[in-house]
Amino acid sequence: MSLISRLKAVVAGDEYLEDDFDELDYASEDELNDINNFKQNPKNANALANSNPFDFMNNNRSSKVVGMPGISNSSSEVSLMEPRSFDEMPQAIQALRERKTVILNLTMMDPDQAQRAVDFIAGGTYAIDGHQERVGESIFLFAPSCVNVTSSSPEEASPSSVSTEKTPQYSLGKNTTPEPAWGNSKLSAYS
């Protein structure tokens, strides 16, 4: 086909040009004969019939399983942080994203900044379906979803996973949970 006729065909919108077609690759007679000879041999036929097509261990194929990044069967890591300002909180979020448990000791922070930090990390923990727990006064535990957190404190009925209640629980009577240094212990649920 000449160059001019090709250009005319392209401009006219002809999708199929004379020389352009898809060739299907068919097996040659020699290949078909080899396959038939293989099947006719009783030893090969039994081996083929008894083979498991899903047995990946005996096949000479390489495994195509790819591990999840950040997930390992080795020991888990715990990151202990004692931030002095809110600017250090993205490091805690990054540790949670890397599936590390984070313990925050907020005694060195200003009370307003500490409350903001807890809210920020709690939001990040919620976003990754993680768990959060108050460990002590101004000390909090944040864990990714791959970590089970249980509590064996005497005020709970039985050890269980971390509660994920959304509403704050305040009591006017005896306090059973530790209060943060900046908290007001005389809060009511409706004030």
Swiss-Prot record:
GO BP field: division septum assembly; FtsZ-dependent cytokinesis
This protein's record includes keyword Cytoplasm: yes
Gene3D superfamilies per UniProt: SepF-like protein
Cell cycle as UniProt keyword: yes
Pfam family, one: SepF
InterPro entries listed in its UniProt record: Cell_div_SepF, Cell_div_SepF/SepF-rel, SepF-like_sf
Listed Polar residues bias regions: 165-178
Annotated segments matching region Disordered: 151-191
Low complexity composition-biased segments: 151-164
Location (main, coarse): cytoplasm
Job of this protein: Cell division protein that is part of the divisome complex and is recruited early to the Z-ring. Probably stimulates Z-ring formation, perhaps through the cross-linking of FtsZ protofilaments. Its function overlaps with FtsA.
Family as reported in the entry's similarity comment: Belongs to the SepF family.
Subunit text: Homodimer. Interacts with FtsZ.
HAMAP family listed in its UniProt record: SepF
Protein name: Cell division protein SepF
